[in-house]
From Swiss-Prot:
This is tRNA pseudouridine synthase D. It comes from the Bacteria. Gene3D superfamilies: TruD, catalytic domain, TruD, insertion domain. Its EC number is 5.4.99.27. One of its GO terms (biological process) is tRNA pseudouridine synthesis. GO terms for molecular function: RNA binding; tRNA pseudouridine(13) synthase activity. It comes from Klebsiella pneumoniae (strain 342). It catalyses: uridine(13) in tRNA = pseudouridine(13) in tRNA. InterPro entries: PsdUridine_synth_cat_dom_sf, PsdUridine_synth_TruD, PsdUridine_synth_TruD_CS, PsdUridine_synth_TruD_insert, TruD_catalytic, TruD_insert_sf, TruD_pseudoU_synthase. Belongs to the pseudouridine synthase TruD family. Disulfide bonds: none annotated. SUPFAM superfamilies: Pseudouridine synthase.
């Protein structure tokens, strides 16, 4: 299995070193749900600014304040403890008066707004995240500047970030141990983390190998192409290659790679053969995903940071601003800019 720090770079390995997350304020994440609260319903959406608190900890504290069970508080995505993050929590409080959440107090947290909502906020039910990232102690400003311009034009590989695999790769190691054992894993959190790490590693490996072997954004026969900004996709035929290539170049379509699991992977012919060959040696992880009935899916291989801008504070410090769709990782952008020093495995998704 290819380690995260050895995955192929789209723009070549960075020449510059740099410091990521010198302090929590250097990494700001603002969650974008893509919708506003309904203003009525049995749930309450709460927008919280937090620093030094992980999402589950805040959710449990909110449940305690409202005197409801912890499972009645949900969120769209996990946000890291070691960052400044703004996100929504959702509490189910039916048949009750509107709680006064201005009285909710937790060190490092501030309630920004709250309102009634008709539906539960479910995991993954967000549009994306707005990031502000400050990189410090940059050793080669011009190399970073050139790479930023290239990223604006060509994007970055849509790798799952190191945080998906746990500190020291613990989630992936757990998946590998589980794959080699017949013993069931009953802890729901461990199951979720380990299966996610397994599938993410297999995806990353496909992308890395394709990037190394071929022109990364070249459509091949049988590729599954995704409509930009949407989850639907179709398989390209030989007759459609030329037209599809033009649409990929214009960012109307995105080439995808497999998120392996049970069922049809989605690609066909040359593309399917290449995907299977890329992870052919990872038989135990593939078998685990099938055994646990994780359904196969697709994910775009390229990621284009939207609204990308940057501002050099001085020759060694740059502030980046960009928006990423849900499920994408800011670390996949940063790794194309600098060889990082800092907390890579504990960054918010």
């Amino acid at each position: 299995m290819i380690a995260f720090d050895q995955l192929t770079w789209l723009h070549g390995k960075p020449q510059s070193s740099g410091l990521l997350k010198a302090n929590p304020e250097d990494f700001l994440v603002v969650e974008d749900l893509g919708f506003a609260p309904d203003g009525e319903g049995e749930h309450v959406l709460v927008r919280i600014l937090k620093n030094g608190c992980n999402t589950r900890f805040v959710a449990d504290a909110l449940a305690k304040f409202l005197k409801i069970h912890a499972r009645e508080v949900s969120f769209a995505g996990q946000k890291d403890k070691h960052a400044v993050t703004e996100q929504w929590l959702c509490a189910r409080v039916p048949g009750k008066e509107m709680p006064d959440l201005s009285k909710f107090q937790l060190e490092g947290c501030q309630v920004l707004e709250y309102a009634r909502h008709k539906r539960k906020l479910r995991l993954g039910a967000l549009k994306g995240n707005q990031f502000t990232v400050i990189l410090r102690e940059i050793s080669h400003r011009q190399d970073v500047e050139t790479r930023l311009q290239a990223i604006a034009e060509r994007g970055v590989p849509n790798y799952f970030g190191a945080q998906r695999f746990g500190i020291g790769g613990s989630n992936l190691q757990g998946a590998l141990r589980w794959a080699e054992s017949d013993a069931p894993v009953r802890d729901r959190n461990k199951r979720s983390f380990w299966l996610s790490a397994a599938r993410s590693a297999l995806f990353n490996q496909q992308v890395s190998i394709r990037l190394k072997k071929t022109e990364f954004n070249q459509v091949v026969d049988g590729d599954a192409l995704q409509l930009a900004g949407r989850g639907s996709w179709f398989v390209v035929t030989p007759e459609e290659l030329e037209v599809s290539q033009a649409r990929v170049h214009n960012r109307e379509l995105m080439i995808t790679a497999a998120l392996p699991g049970s069922g049809d992977w989605g690609s066909q012919r040359d593309a399917l053969a290449a995907e299977q060959a890329a992870i052919a040696e990872e038989t135990s992880l593939q078998a685990l995903l099938v055994r646990e009935k994780v359904e196969a899916a697709r994910r775009a291989m390229l990621l284009y940071p939207q609204q990308l801008s940057w501002n050099w504070w001085d020759d060694v410090t740059v502030e980046l601003r960009f928006w990423l769709p849900a499920g994408s990782f800011a670390t996949s952008v940063v790794r194309e800019l600098i060889n990082t020093t800092g907390d890579y495995a504990n960054i918010a998704e």
